[in-house]
């Protein structure tokens, strides 16, 4: 077997220019299918995984030498793009489950997923929790065993540069537009000073999902033999 199944990423690798190229967005994601996808498609429907969103995160506005000038600054850089767009909008039906394959391909910045929120008086990320549910199924291209999948309910996630996460995400029953909110971080101590920012929005509208489309798969996809050791 060559590369193991999972969500993987790539970047330009010209020696001497790699950091500059990655900072300028020369990155991408590729998915290798295997038994993991087969199990999800058996539950959600033939070809379902091929219709699910792949979210490639890039940091925007960094300088090629990655320096931040001035003493006493607390910001860790600018916001992020998602598939080359700033704060795009994803559509979901009420109660629908989607598989989000998220890859942080930033040149430097980490990304702390704080949650999914309705708008509040202080801004899009400072309202009430929106009622989304999510369960993690894979990390860095490696699927989780069932015990970890079962224990993973609405986890907060830290994605440093190069990290990938697969999440099954269930939309709330209430229609509306909600913000997926993150904090830009390099070190955990940054979280005390970094404001929440909208990574992208989810518009929940239309006919409510039903059947398997509105359920989490009961058990994680079977763990492959090549990972058993």
Residue locations for each model-derived region?
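Beta-sandwich strand segments
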Residues: 19-24, 42, 189-196
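Extracytoplasmic/periplasmic copper-protein system
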Residues: 27-50, 199, 203-218
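Extracytoplasmic/periplasmic ligand-capture domains
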Residues: 1-2, 167
């Amino acid at each position: 077997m060559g590369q193991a199944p999972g969500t993987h990423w790539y970047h330009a690798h010209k020696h001497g220019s790699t950091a500059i190229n990655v900072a300028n967005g020369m990155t991408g994601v590729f998915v290798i299918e295997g038994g993991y996808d087969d199990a999800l498609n058996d539950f959600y429907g033939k070809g379902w995984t091929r219709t699910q969103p792949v979210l490639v995160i890039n940091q925007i506005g960094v300088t090629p030498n990655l320096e931040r000038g001035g003493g006493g600054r607390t910001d860790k850089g600018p916001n992020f793009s998602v598939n080359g767009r700033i704060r795009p909008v994803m559509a979901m039906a009420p109660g629908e489950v989607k598989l989000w394959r998220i890859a942080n391909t930033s040149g430097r910045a980490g990304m702390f997923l704080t949650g999914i929120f309705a708008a509040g008086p202080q801004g899009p990320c400072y309202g009430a929790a929106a009622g989304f549910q999510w369960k993690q199924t894979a990390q860095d291209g490696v699927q989780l065993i069932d015990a970890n999948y079962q224990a993973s309910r609405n986890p907060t996630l830290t994605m440093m540069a190069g990290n990938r996460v697969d999440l099954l995400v269930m939309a709330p029953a209430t229609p509306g537009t909600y913000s997926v909110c993150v904090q830009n971080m390099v070190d955990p101590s940054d979280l005390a000073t970094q404001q929440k920012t909208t990574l992208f929005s989810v518009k929940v509208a239309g006919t409510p999902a039903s059947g398997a489309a509105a359920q989490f798969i009961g058990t994680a996809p079977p763990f492959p033999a090549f990972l058993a050791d």
